[in-house]
């Protein structure tokens, strides 16, 4: 009984992760500039991958009865590297003066960069 519930919850997490990853892929295709694309990749793809890994983690607990440490390490790795990589991509794009879209109104980074030494 409990194995069926855990398996059902793990399937829900895997499906949610796949849907969020599909939304992230759509954002990468449809968004206009590198800043928006990096934001979509950093936020949505990271959350989607974490849901997929957590669903697999729950599945192994429910069906096999053991904790898979590789999945825990994978979740932690994705949690750290996803937002960090998108931040570095946006910072590099800003430093080489990649243009914004026409819809961008305010450059908040310029004020922050005045007080930062590179």
Curated annotation (Swiss-Prot):
Q: Do you know which Pfam families this protein is assigned to?
A: PhaG_MnhG_YufB
Q: Which UniProt keywords apply?
A: Antiport, Cell membrane, Hydrogen ion transport, Ion transport, Membrane, Sodium, Sodium transport, Transmembrane, Transmembrane helix, Transport
The intrachain disulfides are none
Q: Give the source's domain of life in one word.
A: Bacteria
The topology of this chain with respect to the membrane is:
Multi-pass membrane protein
Q: State the oligomer form and interacting partners.
A: May form a heterooligomeric complex that consists of seven subunits: mnhA1, mnhB1, mnhC1, mnhD1, mnhE1, mnhF1 and mnhG1.
Family recorded in the similarity comment? Belongs to the CPA3 antiporters (TC 2.A.63) subunit G family.
Name the job this protein performs.
Answer: Mnh complex is a Na(+)/H(+) antiporter involved in Na(+) excretion.
Q: In its UniProt entry, what is this protein called?
A: Na(+)/H(+) antiporter subunit G1
């Amino acid at each position: 009984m409990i194995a069926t519930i855990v398996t059902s919850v793990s399937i829900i997490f895997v499906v949610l992760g796949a849907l969020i990853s599909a939304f992230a892929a759509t954002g990468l295709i449809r968004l206009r500039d590198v800043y928006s694309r990096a934001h979509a990749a950093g936020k949505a793809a990271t959350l989607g991958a974490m849901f997929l890994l957590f669903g697999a983690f729950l599945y192994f607990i429910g069906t096999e009865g053991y904790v898979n440490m590789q999945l825990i390490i994978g979740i932690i790795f994705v949690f750290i590297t996803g937002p960090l990589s998108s931040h570095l991509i946006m910072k590099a794009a800003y430093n080489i003066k990649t243009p914004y879209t026409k819809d961008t109104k305010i450059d908040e980074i310029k004020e922050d960069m005045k007080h930062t030494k590179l």
